[in-house]
């Protein structure tokens, strides 16, 4: 395999069993490791030594930061940008691929109009809006951001034709994001070129998303709604889920209605057994 970089994964390791595994605990004791994060880091360090000895470089998902990053590792940041930012600030290379902008297995238009997908909502314009180099980085740190990557996980993609449909034209937007300075980007210009690119791809036999007939954002989400409860205090008798907090205690009375999925930060979720139980204090009789 000719690649200089070898992606070793390193994400979503379930460490709970390691805390009671006799062999894991023995290894931690022998290597003077304080916790299971350091045990994972110990393994990643060993894998890197093996790869480096064979002229290769280690690349892994941002969880490889846990317990201490291997000396020469490159981080691929998927759980947001924080992992990549932490990596470059410590002198390591990073590739940005946050799910919010780069996971092409998400719906690209109104879900009711699309083939079944894993979830989410990532239209072309949102992909194009991404900037992989955070404004919080210094010039030197920014140079360690080596680029961006699109990901397409195939649990809901049964055929090559479906794969093409999910990729095109969003991968064109991500490519332009990666090679363009932010100040040179123009969404109207790119959108026009993307429409032409889709026609060209279809003429060559590719199965692309029908950009010309894109539905776009949920109409209700495009403008606030005014009602008597806007701005009023909400008393939560059952808490909202920490996984779906939206904008916290102001969400239900902010007058903002959500887009197609909760990922826009406007949908608040209640998954407790008692579900939704709130009181809205109107401040006066209504």
Question: What is the predicted function of each stretch?
Answer:
Residues 57-73, 78-222:
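Flexible, acidic glycine-rich loops studded with aromatic residues
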Residues 34-35, 158, 162, 267-270:
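Short, contiguous acidic/charged loop-to-helix segments that flank catalytic cores in large enzymes
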